């Protein structure tokens, strides 16, 4: 059974959209999802339903600036001006605490994909005690510290000139360009995301997967990766 609910974000303003998938029988284990950049948790519905058939309770939230965890269209790809990365991590922890109260006696696992895997790695450092296991999927290798610093500096400069809600094609290309280069000639802007052409076409045509991150979100993401 699939249900939706909201809970207050750590940013103090946003209601975090959440989906839970419940198995029909006894819950054998819990899996909490942490989705990637420029997507949303309902994209994992087919996967979650499969796990439900195996006895898993699956739950996940849309991160700040994603899916239905926004107050307006201008908030897509925006976290929080000062504490964005910490707020996203805090929301993951809030959901885990709520879920553990429902199912305190079963194994608890977390899965993070792409940006969500980076968040999960940070989460484990801060709140990992008690987790039964974690799946780090589509994650990044060790990042160049100089490049991260340059990325942060560029975002700060652009924020001074344009504001933290500014969407920079330059920063976006710096982050995603290397992935695209390996898939030429490219049929879409996101050939690197999946080899399943049907899923790829659904992805690129989905307005909730088509926005550009603000310099705020990129800056906060770079800060998190540095941790």
Please provide the spans of the model-predicted regions.
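Active-site nucleophile elbow and catalytic-triad environment of alpha/beta-hydrolase enzymes
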Residues: 213-227
């Amino acid at each position: 059974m699939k249900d939706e609910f909201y809970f207050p974000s750590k940013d103090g303003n946003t209601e975090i959209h959440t989906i839970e998938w419940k198995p029909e029988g006894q819950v054998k284990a819990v899996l909490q999802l942490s989705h990637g950049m420029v997507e949303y948790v309902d994209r994992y519905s087919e996967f979650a339903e499969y796990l439900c058939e195996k006895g898993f309770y699956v739950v996940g939230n849309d991160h700040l600036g994603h899916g239905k965890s926004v107050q307006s269209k201008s908030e897509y790809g925006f976290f929080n001006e000062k504490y964005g990365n910490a707020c996203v991590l805090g929301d993951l922890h809030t959901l885990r605490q709520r879920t553990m109260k429902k199912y305190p006696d079963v194994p608890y696992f977390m899965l993070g994909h792409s940006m969500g895997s980076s968040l999960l790695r940070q989460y484990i450092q801060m709140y990992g005690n008690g987790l039964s296991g974690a799946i780090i999927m589509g994650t990044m290798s060790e990042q160049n510290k100089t490049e991260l610093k340059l990325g942060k500096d560029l975002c700060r400069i652009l924020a001074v000139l344009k504001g933290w809600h500014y969407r920079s094609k330059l920063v976006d290309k710096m982050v995603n360009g290397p992935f695209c280069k390996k898939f030429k000639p490219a049929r879409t802007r996101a050939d690197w995301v999946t080899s399943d052409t049907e899923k790829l076409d659904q992805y690129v045509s989905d307005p909730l997967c088509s926005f550009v991150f603000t310099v705020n979100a990129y800056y906060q993401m770079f800060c998190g990766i540095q941790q």
